[in-house]
Amino acid sequence: MGQTVTTPLSLTLQHWGDVQRIASNQSVDVKKRRWVTFCSAEWPTFNVGWPQDGTFNLGIISQVKSRVFCPGPHGHPDQVPYIVTWEALAYDPPPWVKPFVSPKPPPLPTAPVLPPGPSAQPPSRSALYPALTPSIKSKPPKPQVLPDSGGPLIDLLTEDPPPYGAQPSSSARENNEEEAATTSEVSPPSPMVSRLRGRRDPPAADSTTSQAFPLRMGGDGQLQYWPFSSSDLYNWKNNNPSFSEDPGKLTALIESVLITHQPTWDDCQQLLGTLLTGEEKQRVLLEARKAVRGNDGRPTQLPNEVNAAFPLERPDWGYTTTEGRNHLVLYRQLLLAGLQNAGRSPTNLAKVKGITQGPNESPSAFLERLKEAYRRYTPYDPEDPGQETNVSMSFIWQSAPDIGRKLERLEDLKSKTLGDLVREAEKIFNKRETPEEREERIRREIEEKEERRRAEDEQRERERDRRRHREMSKLLATVVIGQRQDRQGGERRRPQLDKDQCAYCKEKGHWAKDCPKKPRGPRGPRPQTSLLTLGD
Protein backbone atom coordinates (compact mmCIF):
# COMPACT_ATOMS: atom_id res chain seq x y z
CA MET A 1 0.00 0.00 0.00
CA GLY A 2 1.18 3.50 -0.80
CA GLN A 3 1.48 6.19 1.80
CA THR A 4 -0.09 9.64 1.53
CA VAL A 5 2.37 12.52 1.65
CA THR A 6 1.40 15.15 4.23
CA THR A 7 2.07 18.75 3.25
CA PRO A 8 1.44 21.97 5.20
CA LEU A 9 -1.56 22.70 2.98
CA SER A 10 -3.11 19.26 3.41
CA LEU A 11 -2.35 19.41 7.12
CA THR A 12 -4.28 22.67 7.52
CA LEU A 13 -7.20 21.23 5.56
CA GLN A 14 -7.27 18.18 7.84
CA HIS A 15 -7.42 20.47 10.90
CA TRP A 16 -9.62 23.13 9.31
CA GLY A 17 -11.57 23.65 12.52
CA ASP A 18 -8.40 24.65 14.37
CA VAL A 19 -7.43 26.94 11.48
CA GLN A 20 -10.76 28.75 11.68
CA ARG A 21 -10.42 29.06 15.44
CA ILE A 22 -6.96 30.62 15.08
CA ALA A 23 -8.30 32.97 12.39
CA SER A 24 -11.11 33.98 14.72
CA ASN A 25 -8.56 34.80 17.40
CA GLN A 26 -6.93 37.12 14.86
CA SER A 27 -10.34 38.81 14.24
CA VAL A 28 -10.46 37.57 10.65
CA ASP A 29 -12.49 35.03 8.68
CA VAL A 30 -11.09 32.52 6.19
CA LYS A 31 -12.72 30.26 3.59
CA LYS A 32 -11.34 26.86 2.63
CA ARG A 33 -11.62 27.36 -1.12
CA ARG A 34 -9.78 30.71 -1.13
CA TRP A 35 -7.25 29.25 1.35
CA VAL A 36 -6.33 26.56 -1.19
CA THR A 37 -6.33 29.04 -4.11
CA PHE A 38 -4.01 31.54 -2.46
CA CYS A 39 -1.63 28.87 -1.18
CA SER A 40 -1.34 26.83 -4.37
CA ALA A 41 -1.86 29.44 -7.11
CA GLU A 42 -1.41 33.02 -5.89
CA TRP A 43 1.49 33.09 -3.45
CA PRO A 44 3.84 30.93 -5.57
CA THR A 45 3.68 33.70 -8.22
CA PHE A 46 5.23 36.23 -5.80
CA ASN A 47 8.65 34.67 -6.51
CA VAL A 48 9.66 34.62 -2.86
CA GLY A 49 10.07 30.85 -2.58
CA TRP A 50 6.54 29.93 -1.53
CA PRO A 51 5.84 26.30 -2.54
CA GLN A 52 2.48 25.20 -3.90
CA ASP A 53 1.99 22.87 -0.92
CA GLY A 54 2.53 25.70 1.58
CA THR A 55 5.20 26.21 4.21
CA PHE A 56 5.58 27.24 7.83
CA ASN A 57 8.90 28.99 7.24
CA LEU A 58 8.64 32.39 8.87
CA GLY A 59 11.06 34.02 6.45
CA ILE A 60 8.98 33.08 3.41
CA ILE A 61 5.74 33.95 5.22
CA SER A 62 7.09 37.39 6.06
CA GLN A 63 8.06 38.04 2.44
CA VAL A 64 4.61 37.01 1.23
CA LYS A 65 3.08 39.19 3.93
CA SER A 66 5.09 42.20 2.77
CA ARG A 67 3.81 41.66 -0.79
CA VAL A 68 0.21 41.33 0.44
CA PHE A 69 0.45 44.52 2.53
CA CYS A 70 2.19 46.46 -0.23
CA PRO A 71 0.50 49.91 -0.42
CA GLY A 72 -1.09 51.05 -3.62
CA PRO A 73 -2.40 48.95 -6.50
CA HIS A 74 0.25 46.24 -6.01
CA GLY A 75 -1.19 45.18 -2.65
CA HIS A 76 -3.68 42.38 -2.06
CA PRO A 77 -6.09 43.40 0.74
CA ASP A 78 -8.32 40.38 0.09
CA GLN A 79 -5.45 38.04 1.04
CA VAL A 80 -4.73 39.72 4.38
CA PRO A 81 -6.80 37.32 6.57
CA TYR A 82 -5.14 34.27 5.03
CA ILE A 83 -1.49 35.32 5.34
CA VAL A 84 -2.17 36.59 8.88
CA THR A 85 -3.56 33.17 9.80
CA TRP A 86 -0.55 31.41 8.20
CA GLU A 87 1.71 33.66 10.22
CA ALA A 88 -0.19 32.87 13.42
CA LEU A 89 0.18 29.14 12.77
CA ALA A 90 3.95 29.55 12.42
CA TYR A 91 4.41 31.94 15.36
CA ASP A 92 2.40 29.93 17.86
CA PRO A 93 2.13 26.46 16.31
CA PRO A 94 -0.49 24.03 17.64
CA PRO A 95 0.64 20.47 18.37
CA TRP A 96 -0.15 19.22 14.88
CA VAL A 97 2.00 21.96 13.28
CA LYS A 98 5.07 21.73 15.52
CA PRO A 99 6.64 18.79 13.62
CA PHE A 100 6.54 20.88 10.42
CA VAL A 101 7.92 24.11 11.86
CA SER A 102 11.47 24.88 10.81
CA PRO A 103 13.97 24.54 13.67
CA LYS A 104 15.24 27.74 15.21
CA PRO A 105 18.56 28.89 13.73
CA PRO A 106 21.69 28.40 15.84
CA PRO A 107 23.34 31.47 17.37
CA LEU A 108 25.69 33.47 15.20
CA PRO A 109 29.40 32.92 15.95
CA THR A 110 29.93 36.67 16.33
CA ALA A 111 27.45 36.86 19.21
CA PRO A 112 28.68 34.46 21.90
CA VAL A 113 26.36 33.74 24.76
CA LEU A 114 27.65 34.93 28.13
CA PRO A 115 27.06 32.62 31.06
CA PRO A 116 24.52 34.02 33.51
CA GLY A 117 25.63 35.51 36.80
CA PRO A 118 25.09 33.88 40.16
CA SER A 119 21.67 35.53 40.53
CA ALA A 120 20.42 34.84 37.02
CA GLN A 121 16.95 33.45 36.39
CA PRO A 122 16.13 30.76 33.83
CA PRO A 123 15.22 32.37 30.53
CA SER A 124 11.57 33.17 29.87
CA ARG A 125 9.45 31.30 27.40
CA SER A 126 10.11 33.89 24.66
CA ALA A 127 13.54 34.98 23.42
CA LEU A 128 12.19 38.51 23.05
CA TYR A 129 11.12 38.77 26.68
CA PRO A 130 13.71 39.84 29.26
CA ALA A 131 14.69 37.69 32.16
CA LEU A 132 13.77 39.44 35.40
CA THR A 133 16.30 39.10 38.21
CA PRO A 134 14.77 37.63 41.38
CA SER A 135 15.64 38.97 44.81
CA ILE A 136 16.51 35.48 46.16
CA LYS A 137 19.83 34.06 45.05
CA SER A 138 19.66 30.67 43.40
CA LYS A 139 22.07 28.23 41.93
CA PRO A 140 23.14 29.39 38.45
CA PRO A 141 21.72 27.04 35.82
CA LYS A 142 23.53 25.91 32.78
CA PRO A 143 23.66 28.52 30.04
CA GLN A 144 20.96 27.93 27.45
CA VAL A 145 21.77 28.89 23.92
CA LEU A 146 18.33 28.42 22.37
CA PRO A 147 15.04 29.56 23.91
CA ASP A 148 12.36 27.19 24.99
CA SER A 149 10.64 25.40 22.12
CA GLY A 150 7.26 26.49 23.48
CA GLY A 151 8.03 30.18 22.99
CA PRO A 152 6.98 32.24 19.98
CA LEU A 153 9.26 32.07 16.99
CA ILE A 154 9.90 35.49 15.42
CA ASP A 155 12.37 35.93 12.60
CA LEU A 156 13.91 39.28 13.44
CA LEU A 157 15.93 39.28 10.22
CA THR A 158 12.76 39.49 8.11
CA GLU A 159 11.05 42.23 10.12
CA ASP A 160 11.02 45.62 8.44
CA PRO A 161 13.36 48.00 10.28
CA PRO A 162 12.03 51.36 11.51
CA PRO A 163 12.27 53.82 8.62
CA TYR A 164 13.34 56.80 10.71
CA GLY A 165 15.67 55.29 13.24
CA ALA A 166 18.63 57.55 14.00
CA GLN A 167 21.98 55.88 14.33
CA PRO A 168 23.32 56.30 17.87
CA SER A 169 26.87 57.50 18.35
CA SER A 170 29.65 55.20 19.55
CA SER A 171 29.78 56.85 22.98
CA ALA A 172 26.04 56.50 23.41
CA ARG A 173 26.25 52.84 22.36
CA GLU A 174 28.98 52.20 24.96
CA ASN A 175 26.94 53.92 27.67
CA ASN A 176 23.92 51.82 26.79
CA GLU A 177 25.97 48.63 26.96
CA GLU A 178 27.33 49.61 30.36
CA GLU A 179 23.87 50.38 31.67
CA ALA A 180 22.57 47.07 30.35
CA ALA A 181 25.40 45.23 32.10
CA THR A 182 25.04 46.97 35.49
CA THR A 183 21.31 47.46 35.94
CA SER A 184 19.03 44.74 37.22
CA GLU A 185 15.91 46.10 35.48
CA VAL A 186 15.29 45.71 31.77
CA SER A 187 12.90 47.25 29.30
CA PRO A 188 9.45 45.75 28.83
CA PRO A 189 8.69 43.25 26.07
CA SER A 190 8.51 44.32 22.47
CA PRO A 191 5.34 46.23 21.74
CA MET A 192 5.08 44.45 18.40
CA VAL A 193 4.79 41.15 20.23
CA SER A 194 2.10 42.64 22.46
CA ARG A 195 0.22 43.93 19.43
CA LEU A 196 0.37 40.85 17.23
CA ARG A 197 0.13 38.18 19.91
CA GLY A 198 -2.36 39.07 22.62
CA ARG A 199 -2.11 35.53 23.98
CA ARG A 200 1.44 35.95 25.29
CA ASP A 201 2.45 36.17 28.92
CA PRO A 202 1.51 39.49 30.57
CA PRO A 203 4.34 42.07 30.30
CA ALA A 204 5.90 44.02 33.10
CA ALA A 205 3.83 46.49 35.11
CA ASP A 206 5.24 49.58 33.38
CA SER A 207 4.52 48.36 29.85
CA THR A 208 1.31 48.63 27.89
CA THR A 209 -0.87 45.90 26.48
CA SER A 210 -2.98 48.19 24.30
CA GLN A 211 -2.50 48.79 20.61
CA ALA A 212 0.98 50.19 20.07
CA PHE A 213 1.35 53.59 18.44
CA PRO A 214 3.86 54.12 15.61
CA LEU A 215 5.56 56.80 17.72
CA ARG A 216 5.60 56.23 21.48
CA MET A 217 7.77 57.38 24.33
CA GLY A 218 10.27 54.76 25.41
CA GLY A 219 11.55 54.03 28.87
CA ASP A 220 14.62 56.24 28.37
CA GLY A 221 12.52 59.23 27.28
CA GLN A 222 13.29 58.70 23.57
CA LEU A 223 10.62 58.23 20.89
CA GLN A 224 10.40 54.67 19.60
CA TYR A 225 8.80 53.59 16.35
CA TRP A 226 6.55 50.58 15.88
CA PRO A 227 4.57 50.13 12.64
CA PHE A 228 0.84 49.44 12.38
CA SER A 229 -0.22 45.83 12.86
CA SER A 230 -2.00 43.97 10.10
CA SER A 231 -4.99 43.31 12.35
CA ASP A 232 -5.41 47.05 13.01
CA LEU A 233 -5.44 47.89 9.31
CA TYR A 234 -7.71 44.98 8.45
CA ASN A 235 -10.25 45.85 11.17
CA TRP A 236 -10.27 49.54 10.19
CA LYS A 237 -10.94 48.63 6.58
CA ASN A 238 -13.69 46.08 7.19
CA ASN A 239 -15.51 47.78 10.07
CA ASN A 240 -16.00 51.13 8.33
CA PRO A 241 -17.75 52.22 5.12
CA SER A 242 -15.75 53.17 2.09
CA PHE A 243 -14.67 56.74 1.48
CA SER A 244 -17.06 57.11 -1.46
CA GLU A 245 -19.98 55.76 0.57
CA ASP A 246 -19.51 57.82 3.75
CA PRO A 247 -16.49 60.15 3.58
CA GLY A 248 -17.37 61.81 6.88
CA LYS A 249 -17.16 58.62 8.93
CA LEU A 250 -13.90 57.44 7.36
CA THR A 251 -12.41 60.94 7.70
CA ALA A 252 -13.28 60.92 11.41
CA LEU A 253 -11.56 57.53 11.78
CA ILE A 254 -8.38 58.68 10.02
CA GLU A 255 -8.40 61.90 12.05
CA SER A 256 -8.50 59.93 15.31
CA VAL A 257 -5.65 57.71 14.06
CA LEU A 258 -3.57 60.74 13.09
CA ILE A 259 -4.08 62.34 16.50
CA THR A 260 -3.60 59.32 18.75
CA HIS A 261 -1.04 57.26 16.81
CA GLN A 262 1.15 60.09 15.45
CA PRO A 263 2.03 58.13 12.29
CA THR A 264 5.09 58.83 10.18
CA TRP A 265 5.06 59.58 6.44
CA ASP A 266 5.33 55.89 5.57
CA ASP A 267 2.56 55.02 8.01
CA CYS A 268 0.28 57.62 6.41
CA GLN A 269 0.89 56.11 2.97
CA GLN A 270 0.15 52.64 4.32
CA LEU A 271 -3.01 53.91 6.01
CA LEU A 272 -4.26 55.64 2.86
CA GLY A 273 -3.39 52.66 0.67
CA THR A 274 -5.39 50.33 2.91
CA LEU A 275 -8.49 52.46 3.54
CA LEU A 276 -8.77 54.26 0.17
CA THR A 277 -8.84 53.19 -3.43
CA GLY A 278 -6.21 54.42 -5.85
CA GLU A 279 -8.47 57.11 -7.31
CA GLU A 280 -9.61 58.25 -3.84
CA LYS A 281 -6.03 58.46 -2.62
CA GLN A 282 -4.95 60.58 -5.59
CA ARG A 283 -7.89 62.93 -5.03
CA VAL A 284 -7.03 63.30 -1.33
CA LEU A 285 -3.37 64.01 -2.06
CA LEU A 286 -4.32 66.60 -4.68
CA GLU A 287 -6.67 68.40 -2.29
CA ALA A 288 -4.06 68.27 0.47
CA ARG A 289 -1.44 69.91 -1.77
CA LYS A 290 -3.97 72.62 -2.65
CA ALA A 291 -4.31 73.40 1.06
CA VAL A 292 -0.59 74.24 1.46
CA ARG A 293 -0.17 77.89 2.49
CA GLY A 294 2.74 80.16 1.79
CA ASN A 295 4.54 82.59 4.05
CA ASP A 296 1.71 85.12 3.64
CA GLY A 297 -0.85 82.64 4.99
CA ARG A 298 -2.65 82.23 1.66
CA PRO A 299 -2.76 79.07 -0.47
CA THR A 300 0.31 78.78 -2.63
CA GLN A 301 1.06 76.97 -5.87
CA LEU A 302 4.85 77.26 -5.77
CA PRO A 303 6.22 73.75 -6.32
CA ASN A 304 9.09 74.13 -3.87
CA GLU A 305 6.81 75.24 -1.03
CA VAL A 306 4.18 72.59 -1.82
CA ASN A 307 6.76 69.79 -1.99
CA ALA A 308 8.44 70.97 1.19
CA ALA A 309 5.17 70.89 3.16
CA PHE A 310 3.46 67.91 1.50
CA PRO A 311 5.91 65.79 -0.47
CA LEU A 312 4.81 62.92 -2.68
CA GLU A 313 8.15 61.15 -2.32
CA ARG A 314 9.48 59.81 0.96
CA PRO A 315 11.15 62.73 2.78
CA ASP A 316 14.09 62.61 5.15
CA TRP A 317 12.18 63.60 8.29
CA GLY A 318 13.59 62.18 11.49
CA TYR A 319 10.98 61.82 14.19
CA THR A 320 13.70 62.13 16.84
CA THR A 321 14.34 65.76 15.93
CA THR A 322 12.13 68.75 16.60
CA GLU A 323 12.23 69.83 12.97
CA GLY A 324 11.19 66.39 11.76
CA ARG A 325 8.29 66.21 14.21
CA ASN A 326 7.11 69.65 13.13
CA HIS A 327 7.15 68.53 9.50
CA LEU A 328 5.10 65.46 10.42
CA VAL A 329 2.55 67.54 12.35
CA LEU A 330 2.07 69.87 9.37
CA TYR A 331 1.84 66.90 7.00
CA ARG A 332 -0.93 65.31 9.10
CA GLN A 333 -2.85 68.60 9.21
CA LEU A 334 -2.67 68.99 5.43
CA LEU A 335 -3.65 65.35 4.95
CA LEU A 336 -6.72 65.86 7.13
CA ALA A 337 -7.64 68.98 5.13
CA GLY A 338 -7.29 66.97 1.93
CA LEU A 339 -9.61 64.27 3.29
CA GLN A 340 -12.23 66.85 4.22
CA ASN A 341 -12.08 68.64 0.86
CA ALA A 342 -12.03 65.43 -1.18
CA GLY A 343 -15.05 64.12 0.73
CA ARG A 344 -17.27 66.90 -0.56
CA SER A 345 -19.61 65.80 -3.32
CA PRO A 346 -20.69 67.99 -6.26
CA THR A 347 -23.30 70.62 -5.40
CA ASN A 348 -26.71 68.94 -5.20
CA LEU A 349 -29.38 70.92 -3.37
CA ALA A 350 -31.92 68.16 -4.04
CA LYS A 351 -29.96 65.94 -1.67
CA VAL A 352 -30.19 68.61 1.01
CA LYS A 353 -33.94 69.00 0.51
CA GLY A 354 -34.33 65.24 0.78
CA ILE A 355 -33.15 65.28 4.40
CA THR A 356 -36.32 65.24 6.53
CA GLN A 357 -36.89 64.68 10.22
CA GLY A 358 -37.82 61.15 11.22
CA PRO A 359 -40.93 60.35 13.27
CA ASN A 360 -38.97 59.77 16.48
CA GLU A 361 -35.85 61.82 15.64
CA SER A 362 -34.98 64.68 17.97
CA PRO A 363 -34.57 68.18 16.45
CA SER A 364 -30.89 68.28 17.48
CA ALA A 365 -30.09 65.03 15.68
CA PHE A 366 -32.03 66.19 12.63
CA LEU A 367 -30.08 69.47 12.58
CA GLU A 368 -26.77 67.56 12.64
CA ARG A 369 -27.85 65.47 9.65
CA LEU A 370 -28.95 68.60 7.85
CA LYS A 371 -25.62 70.32 8.47
CA GLU A 372 -23.75 67.23 7.31
CA ALA A 373 -25.76 67.29 4.07
CA TYR A 374 -24.81 70.96 3.58
CA ARG A 375 -21.13 70.10 4.06
CA ARG A 376 -21.29 67.13 1.73
CA TYR A 377 -23.51 68.32 -1.11
CA THR A 378 -22.92 72.10 -1.13
CA PRO A 379 -19.86 74.34 -1.05
CA TYR A 380 -21.34 76.23 1.90
CA ASP A 381 -20.32 75.94 5.52
CA PRO A 382 -23.44 75.57 7.71
CA GLU A 383 -21.53 77.07 10.64
CA ASP A 384 -20.96 80.28 8.68
CA PRO A 385 -23.17 83.09 10.09
CA GLY A 386 -23.98 84.14 6.53
CA GLN A 387 -25.62 80.76 5.88
CA GLU A 388 -27.68 80.71 9.09
CA THR A 389 -30.83 81.95 7.33
CA ASN A 390 -30.70 79.19 4.69
CA VAL A 391 -30.09 76.52 7.29
CA SER A 392 -32.92 77.90 9.47
CA MET A 393 -35.40 77.83 6.58
CA SER A 394 -34.39 74.28 5.69
CA PHE A 395 -34.76 73.31 9.35
CA ILE A 396 -38.32 74.71 9.48
CA TRP A 397 -39.55 73.36 6.14
CA GLN A 398 -38.00 69.90 6.50
CA SER A 399 -38.94 69.30 10.14
CA ALA A 400 -41.76 66.97 11.10
CA PRO A 401 -45.18 68.33 10.00
CA ASP A 402 -46.41 69.10 13.53
CA ILE A 403 -43.16 70.85 14.48
CA GLY A 404 -42.88 72.75 11.19
CA ARG A 405 -46.44 74.13 11.43
CA LYS A 406 -45.87 75.47 14.93
CA LEU A 407 -42.49 76.95 14.03
CA GLU A 408 -44.03 78.80 11.09
CA ARG A 409 -46.60 80.40 13.44
CA LEU A 410 -43.99 81.77 15.85
CA GLU A 411 -44.16 85.48 16.50
CA ASP A 412 -41.33 87.57 15.08
CA LEU A 413 -39.92 84.58 13.20
CA LYS A 414 -37.40 86.67 11.27
CA SER A 415 -35.54 87.66 14.44
CA LYS A 416 -35.23 84.06 15.66
CA THR A 417 -31.78 82.52 15.46
CA LEU A 418 -31.12 78.90 14.59
CA GLY A 419 -30.53 78.14 18.28
CA ASP A 420 -33.91 79.67 19.17
CA LEU A 421 -35.63 77.53 16.56
CA VAL A 422 -33.96 74.39 17.87
CA ARG A 423 -35.05 75.18 21.43
CA GLU A 424 -38.64 75.78 20.33
CA ALA A 425 -38.58 72.57 18.31
CA GLU A 426 -37.27 70.68 21.34
CA LYS A 427 -40.17 72.00 23.44
CA ILE A 428 -42.68 70.89 20.83
CA PHE A 429 -40.96 67.53 20.48
CA ASN A 430 -40.92 66.92 24.24
CA LYS A 431 -44.62 67.81 24.54
CA ARG A 432 -45.55 65.16 22.05
CA GLU A 433 -47.76 62.42 23.40
CA THR A 434 -46.10 59.13 24.12
CA PRO A 435 -47.08 56.02 22.15
CA GLU A 436 -49.16 54.86 25.11
CA GLU A 437 -50.94 58.20 25.29
CA ARG A 438 -51.54 58.15 21.56
CA GLU A 439 -53.03 54.66 21.74
CA GLU A 440 -55.23 55.73 24.65
CA ARG A 441 -56.39 58.81 22.74
CA ILE A 442 -57.18 56.80 19.63
CA ARG A 443 -59.05 54.21 21.69
CA ARG A 444 -61.03 56.94 23.43
CA GLU A 445 -61.89 58.61 20.12
CA ILE A 446 -63.04 55.29 18.70
CA GLU A 447 -65.25 54.65 21.73
CA GLU A 448 -66.76 58.14 21.54
CA LYS A 449 -67.44 57.67 17.84
CA GLU A 450 -69.14 54.35 18.50
CA GLU A 451 -71.28 55.94 21.22
CA ARG A 452 -72.35 58.75 18.90
CA ARG A 453 -73.19 56.32 16.14
CA ARG A 454 -75.18 54.14 18.52
CA ALA A 455 -77.11 57.16 19.85
CA GLU A 456 -77.87 58.34 16.32
CA ASP A 457 -79.12 54.87 15.38
CA GLU A 458 -81.38 54.77 18.41
CA GLN A 459 -82.75 58.25 17.64
CA ARG A 460 -83.51 57.27 14.05
CA GLU A 461 -85.22 54.10 15.26
CA ARG A 462 -87.38 56.06 17.66
CA GLU A 463 -88.36 58.52 14.91
CA ARG A 464 -89.23 55.64 12.63
CA ASP A 465 -91.37 54.04 15.34
CA ARG A 466 -93.20 57.30 16.00
CA ARG A 467 -93.85 57.81 12.31
CA ARG A 468 -95.11 54.26 11.95
CA HIS A 469 -97.34 54.71 15.01
CA ARG A 470 -98.87 57.87 13.58
CA GLU A 471 -99.56 56.18 10.28
CA MET A 472 -101.15 53.20 12.01
CA SER A 473 -103.25 55.53 14.15
CA LYS A 474 -104.52 57.34 11.06
CA LEU A 475 -105.27 54.06 9.37
CA LEU A 476 -107.20 52.72 12.35
CA ALA A 477 -109.14 55.96 12.67
CA THR A 478 -110.12 55.74 9.00
CA VAL A 479 -111.26 52.14 9.41
CA VAL A 480 -113.32 52.91 12.51
CA ILE A 481 -115.01 55.89 10.88
CA GLY A 482 -115.83 53.84 7.80
CA GLN A 483 -117.38 51.06 9.85
CA ARG A 484 -119.44 53.58 11.79
CA GLN A 485 -120.66 55.15 8.58
CA ASP A 486 -121.58 51.70 7.23
CA ARG A 487 -123.70 51.00 10.30
CA GLN A 488 -125.49 54.32 9.96
CA GLY A 489 -125.80 54.12 6.19
CA GLY A 490 -129.54 52.86 6.03
CA GLU A 491 -130.87 55.56 8.27
CA ARG A 492 -129.26 58.16 6.16
CA ARG A 493 -131.06 56.84 3.09
CA ARG A 494 -134.34 57.28 4.98
CA PRO A 495 -134.20 60.64 6.60
CA GLN A 496 -136.54 61.20 9.53
CA LEU A 497 -139.98 62.72 8.82
CA ASP A 498 -141.80 65.29 10.81
CA LYS A 499 -144.99 64.43 12.55
CA ASP A 500 -147.22 66.02 9.88
CA GLN A 501 -145.04 65.17 6.87
CA CYS A 502 -146.04 62.76 4.14
CA ALA A 503 -143.71 59.92 3.59
CA TYR A 504 -144.70 59.70 -0.09
CA CYS A 505 -144.55 63.27 -1.33
CA LYS A 506 -142.64 64.71 1.61
CA GLU A 507 -145.17 67.48 1.97
CA LYS A 508 -146.54 68.47 5.31
CA GLY A 509 -150.13 68.53 6.34
CA HIS A 510 -151.06 64.97 5.65
CA TRP A 511 -149.74 61.46 5.90
CA ALA A 512 -148.95 59.04 3.21
CA LYS A 513 -152.24 57.16 3.30
CA ASP A 514 -154.07 60.42 2.69
CA CYS A 515 -151.63 61.70 0.09
CA PRO A 516 -153.53 62.95 -2.94
CA LYS A 517 -150.63 62.20 -5.16
CA LYS A 518 -150.59 58.55 -4.30
CA PRO A 519 -152.40 56.58 -6.96
CA ARG A 520 -155.63 54.94 -6.01
CA GLY A 521 -157.15 51.71 -7.31
CA PRO A 522 -156.11 48.14 -7.35
CA ARG A 523 -152.58 47.28 -8.03
CA GLY A 524 -151.92 45.75 -11.39
CA PRO A 525 -150.29 42.41 -11.75
CA ARG A 526 -146.58 42.41 -11.97
CA PRO A 527 -145.28 41.86 -15.44
CA GLN A 528 -144.13 38.34 -16.11
CA THR A 529 -140.71 37.90 -17.51
CA SER A 530 -140.84 35.64 -20.53
CA LEU A 531 -138.17 33.00 -20.84
CA LEU A 532 -136.85 31.87 -24.14
CA THR A 533 -137.55 28.29 -25.04
CA LEU A 534 -135.74 25.90 -27.28
CA GLY A 535 -138.37 26.28 -29.86
CA ASP A 536 -137.86 29.98 -30.13
From Swiss-Prot:
One function term, GO molecular function aspect: zinc ion binding
Post-translational modification: RNA-binding phosphoprotein p12 is phosphorylated on serine residues.
Lipidated residues (N-myristoyl glycine): 2
Gene: gag
Biological-process GO terms, alphabetical: viral budding via host ESCRT complex
Chain positions of motif PPXY motif: 161-164
Zinc finger (CCHC-type): 500-517
Biased composition (Basic and acidic residues): 449-464, 484-517
Keyword RNA-binding part of the UniProt annotation: yes
Phosphoserine: residues carrying this PTM: 190
Regions crossing the membrane: none
InterPro entries documented for this protein: G_retro_matrix, G_retro_matrix_sf, Gag_p12, Gag_P30, Retrov_capsid_N, Retroviral_Gag-Pol_poly, Retrovr_matrix, Znf_CCHC
Motif PTAP/PSAP motif, residue range(s) on this chain: 109-112
UniProt protein name: Gag polyprotein
PANTHER family: GAG_P30 DOMAIN-CONTAINING PROTEIN
Motif (LYPX(n)L motif): 128-132
A Pfam family annotated for this UniProt entry: Gag_p30
GO cellular component, one term: host multivesicular body
Comp. bias regions, Pro residues: 108-121
Top-level taxon of the source organism: Viruses
Region (Disordered): 108-218, 449-536
Coiled-coil region: 436-476
Annotated keywords: Capsid protein, Coiled coil, Host cell membrane, Host endosome, Host membrane, Host-virus interaction, Lipoprotein, Membrane, Metal-binding, Myristate, Phosphoprotein, RNA-binding, Viral budding, Viral budding via the host ESCRT complexes, Viral nucleoprotein, Viral release from host cell, Virion, Zinc, Zinc-finger
Marked site (Cleavage) residue numbers: 129-130, 213-214, 476-477
